[in-house]
Regions:
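Alpha-helical transmembrane segments of multi-pass membrane proteins predominantly involved
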Residues: 2-518
Length: 518
C-alpha cells in the first residue's frame, strides 16, 4: 500500500511539473531499515535456524539509518534535508523534508528500535515465535517512523504513520498467549479508530487548503481567509485527536496499560519510546507550519493542545501513584510524560518545538533504562520480567547496584530531581515557551504536576534503597517468600550501559543535547 501511494503521488506530480529528484542517500533513515527487513527474510530463507545473522542484519540496518540522519541533525547551516522534489514547485514541492529536529528524532527512534531489538534478543529462548519475523517487524516499524517524521505530503504521512504502528500489533500478539491476544486486539482497535479520525482530518485539511502537501504556502493562503481558517483549525484539531491515540494522551490513553502489561517487555519498550518519537515527529510536521501564523493571544489550537497535555500529566501521575507493578507504573508514566512532550507545543513557536523534541528524547532514554531493568528481574525459573511487583524491587539498589542504580537514575530523570539534572532541565525547558507565550495557567498546572510526579517516583526510589528482604530458596522447604532472580542478558546489559552513560553525561553537560537542538 505504501508503494502504491508513493507511486501514484509521484506519477501525478511528475505529470504536472516534470521529473522528480530522488537522492537515495537522503532517504537512508527510512530506506536502510526497510531494505534490512527484506534482507532479514532473505537470510532466514537461506539459514532458517540461525538467530545471530538476523540480529546482526537488523542492528546494522538501524545503525545505517541513524548514520544517514546524522548530516541533517549536525548541519551547521540548519538547512533541511530535501529529496523527492519537483523543480520550481512551491516550497520546493518536496515530499521529504527533514530539518535538524526531524533528523534528531529519526536518530532517536532508530536508536530506541535498536534497544528494543537487543532487549528482545535476550528473550528469544523464552518466547515463542519466528526470530526473523520479530526483526523484520521491528525494522518495518522503524522505517515507517523515520518516514513519517520527514513526510511532507498527507498521503505519505498517513501511510507511514500506520506502517510505524501496525507491525507493533503483530509483535504484541506473536507471544501466543490469551493475554497477549487481548493486548494486541486492544491496540489494533485503537489503531483503526485513530486511522479513521486521521482520514477525516486529512479530508478537512485538503478542503481547507486545496492541497495535500504540508507546505507553509498552502497554510498561509488558507489562514488569510476566515472561512478557510475555520476549516483548517478544525482539520488540525481532528488530526491532533487522531495522534492523541498514538501518543497516549488523555482521554485517548485507555489502550496503553493493558497493552504494556500483556505484551513482551521489549515490545512495551518499543511502544513507549520509538513509537512515541514517531508520533511526535508526525505531530511536528503538522504544527510546524503554524508557527508565526496564529494570533498573539491563545486561540482554539493552543487551548486544546494545552488542555490535553495538562490532563495527561495529571491523570497519568495520579494513577501512577497507586501502581504497585513496575510495568503499570511505566505505562501510566508514559501517559504523564506524553503530556510533558506535547505541553510546549501549545505555545505554537519554534522554541516550543525544540523543547518538545528535547523532552521526548530525554523520556525515551530514561524509559529504555527502566524497561531494561524490568526485563532483568524475574521469579526463579520464570520468564524475563515475570516479577514486576513493588516487593520484588525492595533493596534492589543494595543487593544488585548494577541494576538498581540505573533504575534510580531513570526514575530521578522522569521526576526531574537532582542528581539527574537532565530531567530537571527538560521540565524547565518545556515550561519556558509557555511563559514566553503568556500561557501562565498552563505553566502553573505544569508545576503542580511536577510536585505530584516527585511523590510517584520517590516512592519507588525509597523501595529500591530499603534494606533487602530475606528470601528463602526452594531448597529450604520454606514457602515464606518468593525467590527473585536478577539476570541481565547481553542485550539488556548493552542498553543499561549505554542508556545510563547517556543519562549521566547529559546530566553533567545538558547543554550538549540542548545546544544540538538549538
Amino acid at each position: 500500500m505504501t508503494a502504491l501511494t508513493g507511486l501514484s503521488t509521484l506519477s501525478a506530480l511528475t505529470a504536472q511539473s516534470g521529473a522528480v529528484s530522488i537522492d537515495a542517500l537522503r532517504l537512508l533513515p527510512a530506506l536502510a531499515p526497510a531494505l534490512g527487513a527484506l534482507l532479514v527474510l532473505l537470510v532466514d530463507a537461506l539459514a532458517p535456524r540461525r538467530t545471530l545473522p538476523h540480529l546482526v542484519v537488523g542492528a546494522l540496518a538501524l545503525l545505517m539509518g541513524a548514520a544517514g540522519a546524522m548530516p541533517g541533525a549536525l548541519s551547521p547551516a540548519q538547512e533541511p534535508v530535501l529529496t523527492l522534489c519537483l523543480p520550481g514547485g512551491p516550497d520546493g514541492a518536496c515530499l521529504w523534508s527533514a530539518g535538524p529536529l526531524d533528523s534528531t528524532l529519526q536518530i532517536g527512534l532508530l536508536a530506541a528500535s535498536l534497544a528494543a531489538l537487543l532487549l528482545l534478543s535476550d528473550q528469544w529462548r523464552d518466547l515463542p515465535g519466528d526470530r526473523a519475523v520479530d526483526v523484520a517487524l521491528i525494522l518495518a516499524s522503524a522505517a515507517g517512523g523515520a518516514a513519517v517524521v520527514a513526510a511532507r505530503e498527507l498521503g505519505t504521512w498517513l501511510v507511514a504513520l500506520e506502517l510505524a504502528t501496525l507491525p507493533v500489533i503483530a509483535l504484541v500478539v506473536l507471544r501466543g498467549t490469551r493475554r497477549a491476544a487481548h493486548g494486541g486486539m486492544t491496540l489494533m482497535m485503537t489503531s483503526l479508530l485513530s486511522f479513521a479520525v486521521l482520514v477525516v482530518g486529512t479530508g478537512l485539511w485538503v478542503m481547507a487548503t486545496g492541497d495535500a502537501s504540508l507546505s507553509g504556502t498552502a497554510i498561509r493562503t488558507a489562514w488569510a481567509e476566515p472561512d478557510q481558517r475555520a476549516v483548517l483549525v478544525l482539520a488540525i484539531l481532528t488530526l491532533f485527536v487522531g495522534l492523541g491515540f498514538k501518543l497516549s494522551l488523555v482521554p485517548f490513553h485507555a489502550w496503553t496499560p493493558p497493552t504494556f502489561v500483556s505484551g513482551p517487555l521489549p515490545i512495551s519498550a518499543l511502544l513507549a519510546t520509538a513509537s512515541k518519537l514517531a508520533a511526535v515527529g508526525a505531530l511536528l510536521a503538522l504544527i510546524a507550519p503554524f508557527a508565526g501564523l496564529a494570533d498573539p493571544h491563545p486561540h482554539a489550537l493552543a487551548f486544546v493542545v494545552g488542555a490535553l497535555a495538562i490532563g495527561s500529566m495529571l491523570v497519568g501521575t495520579v494513577v501512577a501513584f497507586r501502581a504497585t507493578d513496575l510495568v503499570r507504573l511505566l505505562a501510566w508514566s508514559t501517559i504523564a510524560q506524553a503530556g510533558w512532550v506535547v505541553l510546549p507545543l501549545a505555545a505554537l513557536t519554534t522554541v516550543g518545538h525544540r523543547a518538545s523534541v528535547a523532552y521526548a528524547l530525554t523520556y525515551a532514554a530514561a524509559g529504555l533504562v527502566a524497561f531494561a531493568v524490568a526485563t532483568a528481574v524475574r521469579t526463579a525459573g520464570g520468564e524475563p520480567g515475570s516479577e514486576r511487583g513493588l516487593a520484588a524491587y525492595r533493596g534492589l539498589a543494595r543487593s544488585h547496584p548494577h541494576v538498581g542504580g540505573p533504575l534510580i537514575l531513570a526514575l530521578l530523570t522522569l521526576a526531574g530531581l537532582p542528581p539527574a539534572i537532565l530531567g530537571l532541565v527538560a521540565k524547565v525547558v518545556a515550561i519556558r515557551p509557555l511563559l514566553a507565550a503568556g500561557l501562565w495557567p498552563l505553566a502553573v498546572l505544569a508545576v503542580i504536576a511536577v510536585v505530584l510526579g516527585i511523590a510517584v517516583y520517590v516512592r519507588w526510589i525509597a523501595v529500591l534503597l530499603a534494606a533487602p528482604e530475606h528470601r528463602t530458596t526452594a531448597a529450604s522447604g520454606n514457602n515464606a517468600g518468593t525467590v527473585v532472580e536478577v539476570q541481565v542478558g547481553p542485550g539488556a546489559l548493552a542498553v543499561l550501559s549505554l542508556g545510563t552513560a547517556l543519562l549521566v553525561v547529559a546530566s553533567v553537560v545538558p547543554q550538549v543535547l540542548y545546544g544540538l537542538l538549538s
